[in-house]
Amino acid sequence: MLGAYLPIIVLVVVAVLFGCGSLIFSSLIGQKKPSVVKMAPYECGCEPVGSARERFSIKFYIIAMLFILFDIEAVFLYPWAVLFKRLGMFGLMEMGVFIVILFVGYIYVWKKGALEWE
């Protein structure tokens, strides 16, 4: 049982050791001379305009949460699509109920005006 997972375990251990080793090695040999210019926020090669700590409209957060909510739908639909033949009619009905619930949620969000951008 463990032999089947041994290559994956070795790969994860090597990756973690390489990442940690690189960080430790660079912190030991790297120069540490902070200055005002180095500590300034960097915006795509341009001089920063205003503060980096700016308040965003709550609509951005609502859209982001809705995206995550409906994006998780794809996470649940993918395994169902892979196992579609094995699950049969029960799996089809189960996913149908899941999609209907998500669709009702989408209609609710739409009616509440969360998707309006004014």
Swiss-Prot record:
Alphabetically ordered keywords of this record: Cell inner membrane, Cell membrane, Membrane, NAD, Quinone, Translocase, Transmembrane, Transmembrane helix, Transport, Ubiquinone
PANTHER family per the UniProt record, alphabetical: NADH-QUINONE OXIDOREDUCTASE SUBUNIT A, NADH-UBIQUINONE OXIDOREDUCTASE CHAIN 3
Name this protein carries in UniProt: NADH-quinone oxidoreductase subunit A 2
EC number from the UniProt entry: 7.1.1.-
Principal EC category: translocase
Function: NDH-1 shuttles electrons from NADH, via FMN and iron-sulfur (Fe-S) centers, to quinones in the respiratory chain. The immediate electron acceptor for the enzyme in this species is believed to be ubiquinone. Couples the redox reaction to proton translocation (for every two electrons transferred, four hydrogen ions are translocated across the cytoplasmic membrane), and thus conserves the redox energy in a proton gradient.
TM stretches of this protein: 5-25, 62-82, 87-107
InterPro entries, A to Z: NAD(P)H_OxRDtase_bac/plastid, NADH_UbQ/plastoQ_OxRdtase_su3, NDAH_ubi_oxred_su3_sf
Gene name as annotated: nuoA2
Record family assignment: Belongs to the complex I subunit 3 family.
An annotated Gene Ontology molecular function: NADH:ubiquinone reductase (non-electrogenic) activity
Subunit structure: NDH-1 is composed of 14 different subunits. Subunits NuoA, H, J, K, L, M, N constitute the membrane sector of the complex.
Keyword match NAD: yes
GO cellular component: NADH dehydrogenase complex; plasma membrane
Subcellular location as annotated: Cell inner membrane
Organism: Geotalea uraniireducens (strain Rf4)
Domain of life: Bacteria
Catalytic activity of the protein: a quinone + NADH + 5 H(+)(in) = a quinol + NAD(+) + 4 H(+)(out)
